[in-house]
Amino acid sequence: MKDVVIVGALRTPIGCFRGALAGHSAVELGSLVVKALIERTGVPAYAVDEVILGQVLTAGAGQNPARQSAIKGGLPNSVSAITINDVCGSGLKALHLATQAIQCGEADIVIAGGQENMSRAPHVLTDSRTGAQLGNSQLVDSLVHDGLWDAFNDYHIGVTAENLAREYGISRQLQDAYALSSQQKARAAIDAGRFKDEIVPVMTQSNGQTLVVDTDEQPRTDASAEGLARLNPSFDSLGSVTAGNASSINDGAAAVMMMSEAKARALNLPVLARIRAFASVGVDPALMGIAPVYATRRCLERVGWQLAEVDLIEANEAFAAQALSVGKMLEWDERRVNVNGGAIALGHPIGASGCRILVSLVHEMVKRNARKGLATLCIGGGQGVALTIERDE
């Protein structure tokens, strides 16, 4: 099979819920990244074979949002596109599908990633088609129902984090300390400009003025142990998961340009990283956050690596309880994990996050001249994904 490489990796800044990017649809955000990948790599738009983008919240978004992003991003009508929904893993699963297409010879160049605007997810009337003949109708929040609700246990996925905290003995103090560390690492990374190479600025309007958004909006400058300790539990009055030690609701997009190694050589493009292996697993939905343990083990087994060999890891922080449970099971070196902060600080635009962590991983590996990297996420509904990449020595 053909070797698959990444030659471009970009993302938008991550916007707060109803924040700086709220006025831009997921398609608009995704199209900016598609356009920037073409411009920065110099690959002719007509040479792209397919676009694969994850998006979870598609109610009201129009037909095939990935196709919309491709065309709006400057690709010709001849380039096909597909939108996928693997919840939080969508953006990473898109890379897996792209890898398979290239390995099988069905495509030479694919743009893969994810996009999401959680701020614009609509409320829906589920009985409007059949009609409510008498009485009131209830609006359903598609953001929660389609993105954050466990369909099997009929509760918010935050409850699954409480389940993990009890199962693995993760205290409130440990969760808050983890969350504060994520905030501190993210703020230090932003202050040092470590994300600048991966971010595509977004032009937006505010009070009649044009603003350039080029920095992640979510990280807190005022995060403190005392402030985190004052927050009430969000999902269980006697629990430990709070808004401060959980990931947030966000807007953003991320994508990579992938191609066969032979095509990269023919186009004289530098290789940022090689795709080595991918794995997906299923677990009990009530303990969905532990799935990265099994996805990571399967992925490492497929590539023939030991965890200790991996130089850098990006593991999506759905909740501090979840991240700590995974770390406890895998016994990985925390100094190699989410070195610039994770989703608790940076945010979690669900359809984009899988690719966002991969983009950040690639750029940090380049900066550190690291060789082996791992990206992994848990997925609402009881699944997990992992992907390994490698850079040449």
UniProtKB/Swiss-Prot annotation:
Keyword terms: Acyltransferase, Cytoplasm, Transferase
Uppermost EC category: transferase
Coiled coil: none
Pfam families to which the protein is assigned, alphabetical: Thiolase_C (PF02803), Thiolase_N (PF00108)
Cytoplasm as UniProt keyword: yes
EC assignment: 2.3.1.9
Record's keyword annotation contains Lipid biosynthesis: no
Residues the record marks as active site: C88, H348, C378
GO BP field: 1-butanol biosynthetic process
InterPro entries: Thiolase (IPR002155), Thiolase-like (IPR016039), Thiolase_acyl_enz_int_AS (IPR020615), Thiolase_AS (IPR020610), Thiolase_C (IPR020617), Thiolase_CS (IPR020613), Thiolase_N (IPR020616)
Annotated catalysed reactions: 2 acetyl-CoA = acetoacetyl-CoA + CoA
Gene Ontology CC entries for this record: cytoplasm
Disulfide cysteine pairs (residue numbers): none
Compartment annotation: Cytoplasm
Top-rank taxon, per record: Bacteria
Gene3D superfamilies reported for this sequence: 3.40.47.10
MF terms (GO), sorted A to Z: acetyl-CoA C-acetyltransferase activity; acetyl-CoA C-acyltransferase activity
Entry similarity comment: Belongs to the thiolase-like superfamily. Thiolase family.
Protein name: Probable acetyl-CoA acetyltransferase
